[in-house]
Design a protein with these regions (language model features):
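Active-site microenvironments that recognize anionic phosphate/pyrophosphate groups
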Residues: 20
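Bacterial N-terminal signal peptides that target proteins for export
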Residues: 1-9
Length: 252
């Protein structure tokens, strides 16, 4: 059974990486409703981390692979090499939790009106990371978000939120909400800002809220740099004194 699951993951990765892209979402926590175009691919090779008073944790290197399997439908695979470095203790490195998702845009944006595009993006996080080392949740989680976007060239705004099902001892279900406003500065550069809020995911844990500033830079038609940096503005020392995301995106 495990061998069959392994073959399935490898086949999914091959589909994402080898298929013949362009599209928002990363580098921000909030996503957008726009799927990768049909039969095209978007691969983000990323690193990210969050620092708190207790230490630093994140992804040393990860793959966020997206494929337009049908018009208005996108499949996503996220595979991270995670780390957890508590202050005053040994650091842990290893494979983290794997995420599978499907995005379906059920409403297109009106070009001459105010109506936005809207999509659902259900996600399943499989507990492939070692929870005892802080590299995974230890249980299967599901996320059920709705994302909205409207373009006002050269401005773009998107965001939304959803509900995380987070089972396990000491865990609790929680909500995430976020919104982004960004502007195209040049043909190559877009800059923006994000605000977000997340309720506590563990019993006795505090809610978190914060902001990120960042954007994208197009090196050429196929290669793009994605970047953000930010921090919490709610329970900051416990949840997020500094965080970053940096990625090389390949679209084809």
């Amino acid at each position: 059974m495990l061998r069959k699951i392994g073959y399935f993951v490898i086949m999914c990765a091959a589909l994402f990486l080898l298929a013949p892209s362009a599209h928002a979402g990363p580098p921000f926590l909030s996503d957008d409703p726009e799927p990768v175009p049909y039969q095209r691919t978007e691969n983000d090779f990323f690193t990210s981390a969050t620092h708190t008073k207790d230490g630093t944790a994140g992804t040393v290197m990860g793959l966020d692979a997206n494929y337009g399997v049908w018009p208005d439908v996108e499949l996503t695979l996220i595979a991270p090499l995670a780390f957890n470095a508590p202050d005053g203790s040994n650091a842990f490195f290893g494979y983290g939790d794997t995420q599978f998702a499907i995005k379906y845009r059920f409403l297109d944006e009106s070009d001459d009106g105010w109506w936005p595009q809207i999509a659902i993006y259900p996600t399943v996080s499989v507990p492939t990371g070692k929870a005892s080392h802080g590299l995974g949740a230890g249980n299967t989680q599901e996320f059920f978000p709705v994302w909205v976007q409207k373009d006002f060239d050269p401005w773009q705004t998107f965001g939304g939120g959803g509900y995380w099902n987070n089972p396990g001892a000491g865990h609790q279900n929680y909500w995430f909400f976020g919104w982004v406003l960004q502007r195209k500065i040049t043909e190559e550069l877009a800059l923006g800002g994000e605000i977000f809020h997340q309720t506590a995911s563990l019993e006795g844990e505090k809610d978190t809220g914060g902001f990120n500033l960042g954007g994208t830079y197009d090196l050429d038609e196929n290669y793009h740099i994605l970047f953000t940096a930010g921090r919490g503005i709610q329970n900051t020392s416990d949840t997020n004194t500094f965080s970053y995301y940096l990625a090389l995106q390949l679209t084809y």
